Design a protein with these regions (language model features):
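Short acidic/histidine- and often glycine-rich active-site loop of Leloir-type glycosyltransferases
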Residues: 45-46, 102-112, 116-117
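Flexible glycine-rich beta->alpha loop in the catalytic core of nucleotide-sugar glycosyltransferases
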Residues: 40, 77-78, 96-97, 103-104, ...
């Protein structure tokens, strides 16, 4: 698990079903530096602590993900499944995740273990960020748990093990 880095910043990425207005409104003019990566989002005045980037993909995206403190996925509609790829990538890089409630986030995030699932309320988001910034044990525990979950459940090696197990069971039934 990497240190949080010299310049601590929060990363938010993706475009499907995101509510970046909520994120900007909640964290604008706070001490937290925020980087939003989305070709689909613009804001006329996000505040001096929030930067919006377009056309960030591949290696540049992974570089920013590796350097961030944590990842926020603010979802617009709780009934729509979204954010899974960002969840997996954050866990791959051992980054705690803060996300707003939805019907499917619990398939990836266990609140208090590898991230925080919050109601879409300004104070709830600010409190979640504050907790990760101030509580080193919580931060490191969530980072480690997220990385372990990724390796155990979502990595190429874990998928290969599961596929191999299925093939072995199918092969045993032939005899």
């Amino acid at each position: 698990i990497r240190d949080r880095g010299e310049e601590r910043f929060i990363l938010a990425a993706g475009k499907s079903n995101r509510d970046y207005d909520f994120l900007v409104d909640a964290l604008k003019d706070t001490p937290y530096q925020v980087r939003i990566l989305s070709d689909a989002y613009n804001h006329p005045n996000p505040g001096s602590n929030i930067r919006i980037y377009h056309d960030v993909f591949g290696e540049k995206y992974y570089q920013m993900l590796s350097e961030c403190c944590c990842v926020i996925v603010p979802l617009a509609d709780a009934r729509i499944s979204a954010g899974q790829l960002v969840f997996l990538q954050a866990m791959m890089f051992a980054k705690p995740i803060i996300t707003t409630e939805s019907d499917t986030v619990r398939d990836y995030i266990e609140s208090g273990k590898n991230g925080l699932i919050i109601p879409k309320q300004r104070d709830a988001l600010r409190d979640a960020v504050r907790r990760l910034y101030e509580d080193e044990a919580l931060y490191r525990g969530m980072a480690k748990e997220g990385r372990c979950r990724f390796l155990e459940n979502y990595s190429v090696a874990s998928m290969a093990r599961r596929i191999g197990s299925i093939w072995r069971k199918l092969d045993e039934k032939k005899c």
